[in-house]
């Protein structure tokens, strides 16, 4: 990530998460996108009322990296690597899925901090101990990772593949409850 940026990928629920994470529709936005994705990003922002795009970084993140400027890196592991870590250390696991997703099934001992509430619950993220972050598939947890990096957190790891990958491991999980019964 570029320092002090929020990483909201075009490949997921882009408009929804822009709306959740950038509450001020007049906020100036400078885009860092893949080459030839600038127009798509501007159009998608505009469709949901974000008309204050002030420009984009030509060449995207690659141009930033090639310029020698600082950037943030997030450690990432898959579910099987988390399983090994879990057997040895029982890490703090923070699940950024919606409460209903968490209530449906989660890793035993995980803490739920939904992504859309992250800024109100930063105190739940330890600064003095490493932790593991995940969502359902990896999209939302990377948004969370960019926000945490922006706010000074460094010692955490993201689970690539999210709970979908974790669910294939022997990590203890709560009993599955159909989400429709939780309404």
Model-derived regions: residue spans:
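Rhodanese-like catalytic fold shared by cysteine-dependent sulfurtransferases
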Residues: 1-92, 96-183
């Amino acid at each position: 990530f570029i320092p002090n940026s929020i990483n909201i990928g075009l490949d997921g629920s882009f408009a929804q998460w822009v709306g959740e994470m950038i509450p001020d529709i007049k906020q100036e936005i400078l885009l860092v996108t893949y080459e030839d994705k600038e127009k798509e990003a501007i159009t998608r922002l505009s469709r949901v009322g974000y008309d204050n795009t002030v420009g984009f970084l030509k060449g995207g993140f690659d141009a930033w990296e090639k310029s020698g400027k600082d950037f943030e890196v997030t450690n990432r592991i898959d579910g099987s690597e988390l399983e090994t870590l879990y057997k040895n250390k029982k890490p703090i696991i923070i699940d950024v899925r919606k409460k209903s997703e968490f209530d449906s099934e989660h890793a035993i001992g995980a803490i739920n901090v939904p992504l859309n509430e992250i800024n109100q619950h930063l105190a739940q993220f330890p600064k003095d101990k490493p932790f593991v972050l995940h969502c359902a598939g990896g999209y939302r947890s990377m948004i969370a990772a960019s926000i945490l990096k922006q706010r000074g957190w460094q010692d955490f790891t993201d689970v690539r593949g999210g709970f979908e990958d974790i669910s294939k491991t022997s990590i203890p999980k709560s009993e599955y409850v159909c989400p429709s019964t939780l309404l």
